[in-house]
Amino acid sequence: MPQQSFMNGSSLPREFPPRLPSWLKRPIGRASELSTVQQIIKQRQIHTICEEGRCPNRGECYANRTATFLLMGQICTRACGFCQVEKGQAPMMLDQDEPRKVAEAVQLLGLKYVVLTSVARDDLTDGGAGWFVAVMERIRQDNPATQIEVLTPDFWGGMGRERSQKERVLTVTKAKPVCYNHNLETVARLQGKVRRGAKYQRSLDVLRWIKEFDPDIFTKSGLMLGHGETVDEVVETLKDLRSVGCDRLTLGQYMQPSLDHLPVQKYWTPEEFDQLGEIAKDLGFSHVRSGPLVRSSYHAGED
């Protein structure tokens, strides 16, 4: 595949968010559909990454009566340079009724496949691993036919470091989600700038451990392009993911949420995403979603 086509994107000004290309603009969705999902969520005082992360696909997903639930509050103990979720060092107490509320929302939305994610909670003794399990158990109790995908942080932090991190990953893996997602987000060279508090190898370890613990669980990871990565770096990252047995992949475009976030360095074109998607398939990923508006849980239940 010729690589010249990847080099056409120019660097963009750092002073302000540049105008979005036409392929990144999405319809909002019908008000009635948006209102139904939002009411179910707001009435139960639970959170979704769709809202907290200002996902560009939330109109489409809400129209299909789906949402990705954000567990353990909306304040994150990390400060990743790309993420819209609120940051802080004094997160809220856990809502002990959250498992029931999420399970009820799953039932009301009629979800047969649900994605659970969370803020990073480095303040909790187990990083929140046990909370994922508690929510999963309640969903299964009330919705026995519903399949569950999880998207977790790296569970690094607190005491014990690597040993504790591995135990936390095992805790969630033992609960047997149908798919376990942990995002690398960017290439190795840009990890420090994009993912403060995270490490490239540490995230690869998470994905490797899952497969070691339970080879039957699908593993998944994703990258947000547009931080200044090169094609060669992206391909090398995909190879690293395959080396730890990662099954599924998402590739999407980073869009700067505000002036306080990292600026976009390049808008990758739909054609470039298609080319990367073909490379990923050739490398052996069983499921690939690659496009400017693709996000971690986009059409997740259709994989």
From Swiss-Prot:
Main location as per UniProt: cytoplasm
Segments forming domain Radical SAM core: 62-286
Reported cofactor(s): [4Fe-4S] cluster
Chain residues that bind [4Fe-4S] cluster 2: C76, C80, C83
Cofactor, free-text remark: Binds 2 [4Fe-4S] clusters per subunit. One cluster is coordinated with 3 cysteines and an exchangeable S-adenosyl-L-methionine.
EC class of the enzyme, as a word: transferase
Keywords: 4Fe-4S, Cytoplasm, Iron, Iron-sulfur, Metal-binding, S-adenosyl-L-methionine, Transferase
A GO MF label: metal ion binding
Keyword Metal-binding applies: yes
Superkingdom as given in the UniProt entry: Bacteria
Pathway the protein contributes to: Protein modification; protein lipoylation via endogenous pathway; protein N(6)-(lipoyl)lysine from octanoyl-[acyl-carrier-protein]: step 2/2
InterPro entries found in the cross-reference section: Aldolase_TIM (IPR013785), Elp3/MiaA/NifB-like_rSAM (IPR006638), Lipoyl_synth (IPR003698), rSAM (IPR007197)
Reactions listed under catalytic activity: [[Fe-S] cluster scaffold protein carrying a second [4Fe-4S](2+) cluster] + N(6)-octanoyl-L-lysyl-[protein] + 2 oxidized [2Fe-2S]-[ferredoxin] + 2 S-adenosyl-L-methionine + 4 H(+) = [[Fe-S] cluster scaffold protein] + N(6)-[(R)-dihydrolipoyl]-L-lysyl-[protein] + 4 Fe(3+) + 2 hydrogen sulfide + 2 5'-deoxyadenosine + 2 L-methionine + 2 reduced [2Fe-2S]-[ferredoxin]
Subcellular localization(s) per the UniProt record: Cytoplasm
EC annotation from Swiss-Prot or TrEMBL: 2.8.1.8
Residues that, per the record, bind [4Fe-4S] cluster 1: C50, C55, C61, S297
GO CC, one annotated term: cytoplasm
Family: Belongs to the radical SAM superfamily. Lipoyl synthase family.
Stated name of the protein: Lipoyl synthase 2
